[in-house]
A protein has these predicted regions:
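Rossmann-like NAD(P) dinucleotide-binding subdomain of oxidoreductase/dehydrogenase enzymes
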Residues: 104-246, 371
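ALDH superfamily catalytic-core signature
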Residues: 15, 210-351, 414
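Conserved C-terminal structural/oligomerization subdomain of aldehyde/semialdehyde dehydrogenase
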Residues: 11-17, 200, 237, 334, ...
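Structural signal for hydrophobic packing residues in well-ordered secondary-structure cores
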Residues: 37, 41, 56-63, 67, ...
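Residue-level signal for inorganic ion chemistry
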Residues: 12, 48, 70, 92, ...
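Short, well-ordered beta-strand elements within core beta-sheets of diverse protein domains
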Residues: 16-21, 35-42, 127, 236-239, ...
Length: 460
């Protein structure tokens, strides 16, 4: 792809485009980031902590601009874009408040001497981020590494270049040193060259399984540490003792937030028999009451998908599923718009031979399965190549915790849908990737655990 393009998915019209970065621009960016890394090595993280609080304030100050840009580029509801900005500001505040303590040396009990390990920066990190949360995906990597002292080079998705540029601009104007976050528009070949550069010490990617595999291969080839946050086919398990009100509340936006374009959103709704009809009709009520329209307008509850290409891919997946025997319980009426609107749909009767059984459907599609008991629910949940997130709905918390512990996944929410916050680790297993972002675990993703041990007494 030769250019990064801003195309409004509500109108399908391009309103901005950005040329690829030149080789000279990329080299200058790496030089600048590497020089900052060297400088930061001699500074205390307390300074960066104060700067990160200012960045949080700046994000809130520019909420309107950021939210509008995200909505224009990838189509999410404006109110959800505003929520994303506040979430990102809170993540910055979280690391500004707690990051310095997290980086304190950790003592080690040893008979060999006085031992501890330092938590030190490692260098420039290449961040490859997706379009579905244009600000959050960036801040999730930037904020902890800013405290650690690892500058970030950003390659954002091809359809949100304006969001990437605006984010970098606001962070710089908030007082972050030049080189803290540098936005680039590289080609895929240039990205491989960046990863291979000895001044770059790690790669963080959130994206598709295909993209993650290619970038992880490049990182491994060059012995660079990487974290991969990839797709999900998450299970939403409804046990037979689920509270009906809790169930209705949670299903209210479990498959519609961000138009279903959330990697941790529950794609597979696994229901024990007694709640099956209730779940189907609750989802139908949610879907049928959506109002398609301009995502900038307050009354809209069903926005377009992020692109015409994404809509067509999802339509093809649903068509393939139905051809293989899946049944449509409900589908939203036709939408008279030139925008990238997908009609929300509820699918049932999906067997293991169906080609979508182990695919991620990234949009407002609910796949509903019926099972006999907890064991069947767990078995079905784990019969997946993915393991990112899950939900368990039950009135018995201990029972829900027991089920949660048996799911092969990175995250489980009891009596709720997916959730994220600065203090909560984010990541998955299987083909959903490896490593963690956010919390103290994410803070240590690209840290050098540097052992120091004093054995003077043994050699006197």
């Amino acid at each position: 792809m030769s250019r990064y393009q801003s195309i409004n998915p509500y109108t399908n019209e391009e309103f901005a485009s950005y040329d690829n970065s030149t080789a000279a621009q990329i080299d200058d960016a790496i030089n600048l980031a590497h020089a900052l890394y060297k400088k930061w090595r001699h500074e205390n993280p307390e300074t960066r902590s104060r700067q990160l609080h200012k960045i949080a304030d700046a994000l809130r100050e520019h909420e309107d601009d950021l939210a509008k840009m995200m909505t224009l580029e990838m189509g999410k509801l404006l109110r959800e874009s505003r929520e994303e900005v506040e979430l990102c500001a809170s993540i910055c505040d979280y690391y500004a408040k707690n990051g310095v303590k997290m980086l304190a040396p950790t003592p080690i009990e040893s008979d060999l001497g006085n031992a501890y390990y330092l938590k030190q920066s490692t260098g420039v990190i290449m961040a490859c981020e997706p379009w579905n949360f244009p600000l959050y995906q960036v801040i999730r990597v930037f904020a902890p590494n800013f405290i650690v002292g690892n500058p970030i080079l950003l390659k954002h998705a091809h359809n949100v270049p304006g969001s990437a540029a605006l984010t970098a601009k606001i962070i710089r104007r908030a007082g972050a040193p030049e080189g803290s976050l540098i936005n680039l528009y590289p080609t895929y070949d240039q990205l491989s060259d960046i990863i291979a550069d000895p001044r770059v010490q790690g790669v963080a990617l959130t994206g598709s399984e295909r993209g993650g595999s290619a970038v992880a291969e490049a990182a491994g080839k060059n012995l660079k540490k990487s974290t991969m946050e990839l797709g999900g086919n998450d299970a939403f398990i409804v046990l037979d003792d689920a509270d009906p009100q809790v169930l209705r509340n949670v299903l209210g936006d479990a498959r519609t937030y961000n138009d279903g374009q959330v990697c941790t959103s529950s794609k597979r709704i696994i229901v024990e028999k007694s709640h099956y009809e209730e779940v189907l009709h609750t989802l139908k009520n949610v879907f049928s009451n959506l109002q398609a329209g301009d995502p900038l307008e307050a009354g809209t509850t069903l926005p377009p998908m992020n692109s015409e290409r994404a809509k067509e891919k999802l339509e093809a997946q649903v068509k393939k599923a139905v051809y293989a025997g899946a049944e449509i319980f409900y589908q939203y009426p036709e939408i008279d718009s030139k925008g990238a609107f997908f009609r929300p749909v509820i699918l049932t009767n999906i067997d293991k031979e169906n080609p979508i059984y182990d695919e991620e459907l990234f949009g407002p599609v609910a796949e509903v399965f019926v099972v006999d008991d907890d064991d069947d629910a767990i078995q079905l949940a784990n019969d997946s190549s993915y393991g990112l997130g899950s939900s368990v709905i039950s009135n018995d918390i201990k029972r829900a915790q027991n089920v949660a512990a048996q799911i092969e996944t990175g995250m489980t929410v009891i009596n709720g849908r997916w959730i994220t916050s600065g203090e909560l680790p984010f990541g998955g297993v299987k083909k959903s990737g490896y490593g963690r972002e956010l919390s103290d675990l994410g803070m240590m993703a690209f840290v050098n655990e540097h052992l120091v041990i004093d054995v003077t007494k043994n050699n006197q």
